[in-house]
């Protein structure tokens, strides 16, 4: 009897190969006047989140976390920040687990780094650092799946 594992069992199930800023844009359209307008006010700050996945090789995937943040005061943009933060992941998982891991676990691993970039960019732009609250990628995954099912139902 042997307890030897096959080589595929020895591999990590999820490996982070690299992380990087794929695209970053930050603007304060009304500067310097917008700094004065903002004082003592709380702008509305909607955050749009999306996750895209692409295959880059054998069991290797690029996961891109997209954040679009726009601070609005009386309908006017105070600042606009767009970030595409990406990572390349190698997965050694059963086929049925790959999609949820790519859209839930991988963005969850990328988020703290993207959150830090957002805080640094807003601070370096002369604003108070914007500290994003944790995101529920499971809920985002479910909402996306429901949306896709609804679209397929209409087709």
Curated annotation (Swiss-Prot):
Any Gene Ontology CC annotation: cytoplasm
Location (main, coarse): cytoplasm
Localization in the cell: Cytoplasm
SUPFAM superfamilies named among the record's database cross-references: SecB-like (SSF54611)
Entry annotated with the keyword Magnesium: no
Keywords: Chaperone, Cytoplasm, Protein transport, Translocation, Transport
One GO biological process term: protein transport
GO MF entries: unfolded protein binding
Statement: the UniProt record of this protein carries the keyword Nucleus: no
Domain of life, source organism: Bacteria
Stored InterPro entries: SecB, SecB-like_sf
Homology family: Belongs to the SecB family.
Main function: One of the proteins required for the normal export of preproteins out of the cell cytoplasm. It is a molecular chaperone that binds to a subset of precursor proteins, maintaining them in a translocation-competent state. It also specifically binds to its receptor SecA.
NCBIfam families, per the entry: PRK05751.1-3, secB
Subunit structure, interactors included: Homotetramer, a dimer of dimers. One homotetramer interacts with 1 SecA dimer.
Protein name, UniProt field: Protein-export protein SecB
Organism, scientific name: Paramagnetospirillum magneticum (strain ATCC 700264 / AMB-1)
Gene field: secB
